[in-house]
């Protein structure tokens, strides 16, 4: 067995195991990722993120869900990657460019006490609304806004958005009372979503103030989802439920999401290092 160094980090409760692969090209099997992510027999996390060198950006974020499947992007994860590379001296730049499965993203680091990163803003790019590019198997290529979706005995309405990964946003009266763990997996694997989908169940709390629960593709319900929060803001604006500068509460904390004049989405939130260690794999 080999010993693997790691750092566990979280962004508003969305926790991943981070592995610095900038010096050695570390690769793990899906089974090893499942073992590491297991909350009873491993470190416990929503997945594993490798920090790698990049030919296109300053660094690369290589992300895997807790079931071992790969994922294009994680908004909370990229904030933690940004904090790691600065706090651990891999870069002195406060605006590094990070390569993801959703493209190159630029981050803006807010430095706090002890010269450590407190907050991170990420330019998440433009939302994708064309069904075939999300992807959603749909009757045409028109934007899917508040369209009917029948799941069991529930007649829901959904808005489809990609923020580099697919999202299905559903507004409900009370997210806390909604059966997320029952309905979430049924929507995740619905036949209209060929690559599966992340599902957000959203309640309006006030003007430009939303509350979100997330069923993540490949991970189940998580305390937070950054790309999901971006998709929620887009869906809220498209359905005239909210504006373009929104506070979104999640079970793990709060994010500020802004739809800028450029058309890009800006996400701002915290990132925190929990502990580091070694694990036998």
Swiss-Prot record:
> Which cysteines in this chain are paired by disulphide bridges?
none
Molecular function in Gene Ontology: diaminopimelate epimerase activity
Q: Binding of substrate: at which residues?
A: 14, 65, 75-76, 165, 198, 216-217, 226-227
SUPFAM superfamilies in alphabetical order = Diaminopimelate epimerase-like
EC no. given is 5.1.1.7
Query: Which InterPro entries is this protein grouped with?
Result: DAP_epimerase_AS, DAP_epimerase_DapF
What is the annotated quaternary arrangement, including any partners? Homodimer.
Q: What does this protein do?
A: Catalyzes the stereoinversion of LL-2,6-diaminopimelate (L,L-DAP) to meso-diaminopimelate (meso-DAP), a precursor of L-lysine and an essential component of the bacterial peptidoglycan.
Query: What name appears for this protein in its UniProt entry?
Result: Diaminopimelate epimerase
* Source organism of the structure: Leptospira interrogans serogroup Icterohaemorrhagiae serovar Lai (strain 56601)
């Amino acid at each position: 067995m080999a010993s693997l160094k790691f750092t566990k980090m979280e962004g508003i409760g969305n926790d991943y195991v981070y592995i610095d692969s900038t010096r050695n090209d570390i690769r793990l099997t899906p089974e090893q990722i499942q073992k590491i992510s297991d909350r009873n027999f491993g470190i416990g996390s929503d997945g594993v993120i490798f920090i790698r060198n990049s030919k296109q950006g300053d660094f690369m974020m290589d992300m895997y869900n807790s079931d071992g499947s790969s994922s294009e992007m994680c908004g909370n994860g990229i904030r933690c990657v940004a904090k790691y590379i600065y706090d651990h001296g891999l870069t002195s730049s406060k605006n590094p460019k990070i390569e993801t499965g959703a493209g190159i993203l630029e981050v803006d680091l807010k430095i706090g006490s002890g010269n450590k990163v407190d907050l991170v803003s990420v330019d998440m790019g433009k939302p994708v609304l064309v069904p075939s590019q999300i992807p959603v198997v749909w009757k045409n290529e028109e934007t899917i806004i508040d369209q009917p979706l029948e799941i069991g005995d529930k007649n829901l309405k959904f808005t489809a958005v990609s923020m580099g990964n697919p999202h299905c946003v559903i507004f409900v009266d009370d997210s806390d009372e909604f059966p997320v763990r029952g309905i979430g997996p049924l929507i995740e694997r619905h036949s209209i979503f060929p690559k599966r989908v992340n599902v957000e169940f959203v309640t309006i709390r006030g003007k430009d103030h939303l509350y979100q629960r997330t069923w993540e593709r490949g991970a189940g319900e998580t305390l937070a989802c950054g790309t999901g929060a971006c998709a929620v803001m887009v869906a809220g604006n498209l359905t005239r439920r909210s504006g373009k500068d929104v506070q979104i509460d999640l079970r793990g904390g709060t994010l500020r999401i802004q739809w800028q004049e450029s058309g890009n989405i800006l996400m701002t939130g915290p990132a925190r290092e929990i502990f580091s260690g070694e694990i036998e794999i």
